Amino acid sequence: MTAKNVGLPSTNAKLRGFIDQNFSPSKGNISLVAFPVSSTNSPTKILPKTLGPINVNVGPQMIISTPQRIANSGSVLIGNPYTPAPAMVTQTHIAEAAGWVPSDRKRAREFIDSDFSESKRSKKGDKNGKGLRHFSMKVCEKVQRKGTTSYNEVADELVSEFTNSNNHLAADSAYDQENIRRRVYDALNVLMAMNIISSLPTGKKRNQVDCNSAQECQNLEIEKQRRIERIKQKRAQLQELLLQQIAFKNLVQRNRQNEQQNQGPPAVNSTIQLPFIIINTSRKTVIDCSISSDKFEYLFNFDNTFEIHDDIEVLKRMGMSFGLESGKCSLEDLKIARSLVPKALEGYITDISTGPSWLNQGLLLNSTQSVSNLDPTTGATVPQSSVNQGLCLDAEVALATGQLPASNSHQSSSAASHFSESRGETPCSFNDEDEEDEEEDPSSPE
């Protein structure tokens, strides 16, 4: 669409003249073209300063260009409001120019963003994951492989690896030898702070993970062995208490039968009240006995060895426990002994009748022997024959060697001032260590 009448205002706001000219594709010097602008808010248009101040109201959709003679008569000059350079379009395509084509040039902000992203990508590409995390992993692998090594040894190996052309590092890489050694030093400090590796007095680094695992495993095995020994001790105490109950109840039944046969209680001088102790010594022994006024304290002085037996030991020797402590109990006696204890404890009586071997029943002797073979202080192994020899000892010798805690009441000792501990192994006379063990292990048979 072309305009026929054009008015050019002068500086004094008067119309200078009119030009009436019919524009055709072949003639004409000046062409004014108006085309619709999109509905979006377009920025403010800046008119050329060559026209001077203009008082005529011109709409934002009109673009006025200065009159110029165009070499090609079939073309018009159209100014693009978003590009500083004019564009040449033919007159036949004016009707199709409903909008403008954005320029291919990027804005300054786009250039900044693209440059920043490219530089960021280039930095990331240069780093190639070779940060402190990467070096820490490499250092940890080196220390784990060697077990014990030094800083210089690890740094030299990593420098030789990363400076090699086969490891994707160029000669001008930022990770030169000094940088690699610095990162190795930082990685070692981080790993030591995390207790993954430890430093030795000689300056060497040791893989603490493997050392801690081995030490923890050794500590667990020692703790397992200690608990197995506690279980054996608890079983020995349970056995002693059950034998006491069986002996007392069997004695009560025998006295009841004697009263029925004799049709009355025995004479006063023919009975011994429980509890009691028996002191046995040689006839040539000189005994000095002192008794307190209330007859609650007795002081004996012997010039020779003597034996002391309590009532439980005497009852066992009389056969009141049916020979359960030695494993020589018949089926009939075993049936009677099971009837003298609560039903929940009958299974223990059956186990006790098998002899002292029931103390180790259900315990992993193989694992305990393997643990006992290992010296926790030096890590050296003890010969297997010495361990098996210790397990074959009787209860009293095993108690002395510390391998098998058991009661001393099975055999009487001829040592001076030696008391039988069969009655002493009651819950009331446990030492402080046993009381602590009971608090830790509430599921014990007691």
Swiss-Prot record:
Acidic residues composition bias: residue spans: 431-446
InterPro entries from the UniProt entry: E2F-DP_heterodim, E2F_WHTH_DNA-bd_dom, TF_DP_C_sf, Transc_factor_DP_C, Transcrpt_fac_DP, WH-like_DNA-bd_sf, WH_DNA-bd_sf
SMART domains, A to Z: DP, E2F_TDP
One cellular component term from this protein's GO annotations in UniProt: transcription regulator complex
Low complexity bias (residue ranges): 406-419
UniProt region (Dimerization), positions on chain: 219-292
Keywords: Acetylation, Activator, Cell cycle, DNA-binding, Nucleus, Phosphoprotein, Transcription, Transcription regulation
DCB2: region residues: 274-330
Key word Transcription regulation present: yes
Modification type Phosphoserine: residues: S24, S42, S122
The UniProt record lists the keyword Membrane: no
Motif residue range(s): Nuclear localization signal: 103-118
Source superkingdom: Eukaryota
DNA-binding region(s) from the entry: 129-210
PTM summary: Phosphorylation by E2F1-bound cyclin A-CDK2, in the S phase, inhibits E2F-mediated DNA binding and transactivation.
Gene Ontology MF terms: DNA binding; DNA-binding transcription factor activity
Residue numbers spanned by region Disordered: 404-446
Motif (DEF box): 176-210
Biological-process GO terms, alphabetical: negative regulation of DNA-templated transcription; regulation of cell cycle; regulation of DNA-templated transcription
Family note: Belongs to the E2F/DP family.
Subunit structure: Component of the DRTF1/E2F transcription factor complex. Forms heterodimers with E2F family members. The complex can interact with hypophosphorylated retinoblastoma protein RB1 and related proteins (RBL1 and RBL2) that inhibit the E2F transactivation domain. During the cell cycle, RB becomes phosphorylated in mid-to-late G1 phase, detaches from the DRTF1/E2F complex rendering E2F transcriptionally active. Interacts with GMCL. Component of the DREAM complex (also named LINC complex) at least composed of E2F4, E2F5, LIN9, LIN37, LIN52, LIN54, MYBL1, MYBL2, RBL1, RBL2, RBBP4, TFDP1 and TFDP2.
Task performed by this protein: Can stimulate E2F-dependent transcription. Binds DNA cooperatively with E2F family members through the E2 recognition site, 5'-TTTC[CG]CGC-3', found in the promoter region of a number of genes whose products are involved in cell cycle regulation or in DNA replication. The TFDP2:E2F complex functions in the control of cell-cycle progression from G1 to S phase. The E2F1:DP complex appears to mediate both cell proliferation and apoptosis. Blocks adipocyte differentiation by repressing CEBPA binding to its target gene promoters.
Protein name: Transcription factor Dp-2
Organism: Mus musculus
